[in-house]
Design a protein with these regions (language model features):
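Secreted, propeptide-processed cysteine-rich mini-domains
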Residues: 4, 9-14, 23-27
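Short, solvent-exposed mixed-charge patches
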Residues: 372-374
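Long, low-complexity or tandemly repetitive, helically biased scaffold regions used
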Residues: 28-32, 41, 46-51, 60-63, ...
C-alpha cells in the first residue's frame, strides 16, 4: 500500500484530473430507456471561474445563469473549453480499443474527475443489471465456462475484478441518509457483493496486479512523456510523482514475476488474439453508452479505457512483432490508466482495511457461501 498515497496525489494534479469523454450518446444495443434523473447521477457543467487560468479560452462566454457546482455536492464540473495546445506532445487519433471517436471534439467534453467522485448514485435495478449482463456476455458466450480457453478466463477475471472494484467504491462511499446528505460505509454491501465470494476478491487483486504490471512495462515511455498543462509548478510535481511511482521498489518487486497468462499473447496467434480482444473492448466500451446514469457512464468509460490501455501495453511489449516499433499512447489513455490504477489501489486498500470486520461478519453468517450471480 506504499503506492496508494502516490497515486492519490498524482490523480489530483491538473494533468490527470481532466478526462476527455463523450457523455451524451445513443445506446447501440437496445432502445434507450431514459436517463437516471437522480441528483447523484448527474455531471453538471460549471462556470469558467472554477477552472485554472490555463484551461480557459477567452472566446468562451458564460451567462449569469451558469450553474455553480461546489465540491462535496453530487454534481460535478465539466470543462468543455480545454485548449488542446495545453497538452502538446501527445498524439490525437481515434482509439481502436474504444467505441467513441475521440477525434470528434464537438461530441467530447472534458470532465474534472476530482469533482465527479465515483460513489453510490442510486443507479440500480433492471437497467444496471442489464449492463453487467451484456458486459459478461462479451466473453466467449458460445462456450460453457468449463470449456473456456485461457484468454477467455483472463478476460473474465479482469471484468469480474473491475466489477468487484466498482462494488467496493460504491460500498465505501454510500449515501446512508439522503435527507441529511450523510455518506459513509455500507459494510453489508461490501460483504454481500464482494467479500463472501473469494473468487471476486482474487479477481480484484488479479486486475490490480495486471495493471501494475502494464505500468512497469511502459515505464520508459511514461517517464519521458510530457505532462505539460501550462502550470510549471504543478507540472514538475506531476513528473516527480510519476517517477516516484514508476521506480518505487515496492512496485518493481510486486511485478517482477510475469503472469503466466501473458504467455497466451505470444506466438503465431498473437495478432488474431489482439484483434479479438480489441473488438471485445470496443463492444464493452459501446455498452457503456447504454448506462443510464451519467456519472456511472463516465467512470465506466474511463475504467474500461484504462484496462484496454493496460492490455495494449502488455500486448505491445510482449509481442514478438513489435521489435522495430515504438509504443504510442494517447494522453487520454495515460490519464485513464493511472486513474484506473488509483481506483483499484483504493479498492484493494479498503478490502484489506475492512478484512477483520469482514471476517467477523463471516463467522456470524449462517447463509451459504457458494457462488451466487452478480
Amino acid at each position: 500500500m506504499v503506492l496508494h498515497p502516490i497515486l492519490q496525489d498524482l490523480v489530483k494534479t491538473p494533468f490527470f484530473r481532466y478526462f476527455k469523454v463523450k457523455l451524451w450518446c445513443d445506446c447501440p444495443f437496445w432502445p434507450d430507456d431514459g436517463m437516471c434523473y437522480l441528483r447523484d447521477c448527474t455531471v453538471c457543467e460549471c462556470p469558467e471561474s472554477e477552472f485554472p487560468e490555463p484551461f480557459k479560452k477567452s472566446s468562451r462566454l458564460f451567462s449569469a445563469d451558469d450553474v455553480i457546482c461546489q465540491e462535496g455536492k453530487p454534481q460535478a464540473a465539466v470543462d468543455r473549453t480545454l485548449d488542446d495546445t495545453i497538452f502538446k506532445g501527445w498524439i490525437q487519433i481515434d482509439n481502436p480499443w474504444t467505441y467513441d471517436d475521440e477525434t470528434d471534439d464537438a461530441a467530447m467534453t472534458y470532465v474534472n474527475l476530482q469533482l465527479n467522485p465515483e460513489r453510490y448514485t442510486g443507479y440500480a435495478g433492471p437497467s444496471a443489471q442489464r449492463i453487467w449482463t451484456a458486459v459478461y456476455k462479451e466473453n466467449c458466450p458460445q462456450y460453457p465456462s468449463e470449456e473456456w480457453c485461457n484468454e477467455k478466463k483472463v478476460m473474465y477475471k479482469l471484468i469480474s475484478g473491475l466489477h468487484s472494484s466498482i462494488s467496493v467504491h460504491i460500498a465505501s462511499e454510500y449515501l446512508l441518509d439522503s435527507s441529511a446528505n450523510l455518506w459513509g460505509q455500507n459494510v453489508q454491501m461490501l460483504y454481500d457483493r464482494v467479500w463472501k465470494h473469494p473468487d471476486r476478491v482474487r479477481n480484484l487483486y488479479f486486475i490490480f496486479l495486471l495493471v501494475l504490471r502494464a505500468v512497469t512495462k511502459a515505464a520508459d515511455y511514461l517517464e519521458q512523456a510530457e505532462y505539460n498543462t501550462g502550470n510549471h509548478v504543478e507540472d514538475l510535481k506531476t513528473q516527480s510523482l510519476v517517477r516516484q511511482l514508476l521506480y518505487n521498489n515496492k512496485l518493481l518487486s510486486a511485478c517482477r514475476v510475469p503472469f503466466d497468462e501473458v504467455n497466451i499473447w505470444q506466438g503465431q496467434n498473437g495478432p488474431d488474439l489482439l484483434q479479438q480482444i480489441q473488438n471485445q473492448f470496443r463492444n464493452i466500451s459501446a455498452i457503456m453508452n447504454c448506462v443510464g446514469c451519467e456519472k456511472c457512464r463516465l467512470w465506466g468509460k474511463l475504467q474500461v479505457n484504462g484496462l484496454a490501455t493496460a492490455l495494449k501495453v502488455l500486448f505491445f511489449v510482449d509481442g514478438k512483432n513489435n521489435v522495430n516499433k515504438t509504443l504510442q499512447l494517447q494522453r487520454n489513455e495515460v490519464i485513464a490508466l493511472f486513474n484506473l490504477l488509483n481506483r483499484l489501489s483504493q479498492s484493494v486498500k479498503f478490502v484489506h482495511d475492512m478484512g477483520p470486520l469482514m471476517e467477523k461478519m463471516e463467522r456470524h453468517d449462517s447463509s451459504p457461501t457458494g457462488k451466487t450471480p452478480w
